[in-house]
Regions:
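Basic, helix-initiating cap at the start of DNA-binding domains
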Residues: 1-53, 70-73, 99
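Hydrophobic/aromatic-rich alpha-helical bundle segments in the mid-to-C-terminal region
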Residues: 126-130, 142, 146, 163-212
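Short helix-capping/turn signature of helix-turn-helix
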Residues: 65, 130-137
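Alpha-helical structural segments
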Residues: 24-35, 39, 52-53, 70-94, ...
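Short helix-coil transition/hinge motifs at the ends and kinks of transmembrane helices
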Residues: 93-104, 165-171
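A conserved beta-strand->loop->alpha-helix hinge within the catalytic CA
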Residues: 49, 102-107, 175-178
Length: 215
């Protein structure tokens, strides 16, 4: 909705402080937290520091989140939704009659690339994904991130089983599980290296060549 500008015979209305729309302040808090996680010493973020960055009181934060742990839960919700929604699209791209072995390998490639590219675009969230930002928080948060990577590994196993069977393996399920485990460890290692290097070593560095050795 637009408003008509005052004419010359009208006095301008007094300027009022713009109030955040419902949900907007909550989003601003999460964006500020994610931005702070990109900085050195991010594992020691306090609600006081977060409130100072936003120019509000700590009480204002608690009107939207009951605790800092709840803020991290909201970040994890975003990570899961962003990654799993796209991953589902990748897995659904196969043939209705079944995924050919070569297509399964391509899907696995795309899943790994998806996670690493997401981390590269969201460096602050990488510290949540690898657990650095969760060390002093409630253990349920780390458990959720563990489940996140477990789900990725399960999806990779699903992608790779047709290839293991087509290769004549006597134990295709086991072989697919081993391959999925290796890929998951690889992407976790890339994300950890990104965080430990001060966000300098990009997760997608030499990605195509690296995956060519594993797929």
């Amino acid at each position: 909705m637009t408003e008509q500008a005052p004419t010359s015979s009208q006095a301008p209305a007094p300027t009022e402080r713009k109030r955040a729309r419902p949900g907007e302040r909550r989003e601003q808090i999460l964006q500020a937290l994610a931005a702070m996680l990109e900085q050195p010493g991010a594992e020691r973020i306090t609600t006081a520091a977060l409130a100072s960055r936003l120019g509000v009181s700590e009480a204002a934060l608690y009107r939207h989140f009951a605790s800092k742990a709840q803020m991290f839960e909201a970040l994890i919700d975003f990570i899961e939704q962003a990654v799993f929604t796209r991953m589902a699209q990748i897995l659904e791209s196969g043939s209705p009659e079944g995924v050919p072995p070569e297509e399964g390998a391509r899907q696995a490639h795309r899943v790994v690339a998806l996670v690493l590219q997401f981390g590269e675009r969201n460096p602050g969230l990488v510290r949540v994904m690898v657990g650095d930002a969760l060390v002093l928080e409630h253990e349920r948060l780390q458990a959720r991130m563990n489940q996140f990577f477990d789900r990725i590994e399960s999806s990779l196993r699903q992608c790779l089983r047709p290839a293991a069977g087509a290769a004549g393996s006597a134990t295709p399920s086991v072989d697919a599980q081993v391959a999925a485990s290796v890929l998951t460890a690889f992407l976790q290692g890339r994300l950890q290296r990104f965080a430990r290097s001060g966000l300098r070593r990009l997760p997608t560095e030499h990605l195509e060549a690296s995956l060519a050795l594993m797929l």
